[in-house]
């Protein structure tokens, strides 16, 4: 089995995903055959892997950093929250049903076999596997049957490095507290720690590093400064969206309602990277900006529930006002379904609401179906006759008069719909704005001269800068020697 190192955090959103992506690129730059692995992920920000299943978007990015095709085995267990009490369970890329609270806790030991099978497949032929944990290993209420953190590490005998986030404060207490809470068997798996997201003079933290080592016995592998390259990489968690603030006025304002179960929000990243575009994430309780030229209704894990939430916030009325002012609207996947006259869910796939009136901005209707469409696609934009590469992850079939004006052509069938005046658009395709020529033409049609940015190259450049920053700030030789 390949050598491996596992990175666990003192909590969620400490930066594990990006750190692992950066370290994957570091290892690749050093000539190692490196692979990413995350036993269990909880995220609605999913990707379609190169072998045709669903994985966390973070593992897709990590595979890119490794320079290898993504695989369902890089993230064998994916939980996609769809209600407050339950998540859709994806095992090795395929839907296995719904996981609810206590039932899932009882199911986890059975999933360890799939996790270990995938871990072996990922490690086959690799020099190094970099493993990412989930949340915190100190959640002792979740330790029994754990497959995400120490349960996996002890089962697979993989050494652990703890990651602490100093930007949120309390990093010393987080690390020392984790040491205190962990049972002896788990504590013995930890070989050291690193500090992430430091701002200012790092030398001022030297005494604190020594104190953490004194309290825990763990060595420090370094302090990672706040790296600007991180902001140019796709974020995994919607919590990052909540921190977005408006900047200087740009030529085009793109407003995005923050739906409770927003999914695949990295669709927006190429727009955010355009110098003339400002993407405004609109939180619940706030109004859509009146100066927006485009409103994007994003993907969602629960279309009907999020449509109800959209109405509760008054965004439906604001959308109508936006259209009357001459604004444009783009619905992606679940957002596309919302734009129609009606959504029917006769089998109750999404919940108890079996039929709901849509926003009525497109003359279409959607019927949910049990079979889930999961695939990477090559398409042609029928708006601008430009090639597109994207992916579909959805349930439901949409039909209606406005489908006669499709958004794109995928092989032998059409996708999406466009209103007669061309200002309301919908598509099932995720990732369309990553296509540079399409994005530039799309923005030009909205009165904005798009730049010459190559989005994929910009992501590669950001990964390169991230790797350089980690090489400069961490004891990479010491880290890799753990495996």
Swiss-Prot record:
Question: Where does the GATase cobBQ-type domain start and stop, copy by copy?
Answer: 251-438
Q: Which InterPro entries match?
A: Class_I_gatase-like, CobQ/CobB/MinD/ParA_Nub-bd_dom, CobQ_GATase1, CobQ_N, CobQ_synth, GATase_3, P-loop_NTPase
Recorded hits in PANTHER family, A to Z, give: COBYRIC ACID SYNTHASE, DETHIOBIOTIN SYNTHETASE
Instruction: Print the keywords alphabetically.
Output: Cobalamin biosynthesis, Glutamine amidotransferase
Tell me, what does this protein do in biology? Catalyzes amidations at positions B, D, E, and G on adenosylcobyrinic A,C-diamide. NH(2) groups are provided by glutamine, and one molecule of ATP is hydrogenolyzed for each amidation.
The family line of this record is:
Belongs to the CobB/CobQ family. CobQ subfamily.
Q: Name one GO biological process term.
A: cobalamin biosynthetic process
The active site lies at 333 (nucleophile), 430
Keyword Nuclease in record: no
Q: Which organism is it from?
A: Brucella melitensis biotype 2 (strain ATCC 23457)
**Under which pathway is this protein filed?**
Cofactor biosynthesis; adenosylcobalamin biosynthesis
GO molecular-function terms, A-Z:
ABC-type vitamin B12 transporter activity; catalytic activity
* Name used for this protein in its record: Cobyric acid synthase
Q: Does the keyword ATP-binding apply?
A: no
Q: Which residues form a coiled coil?
A: none
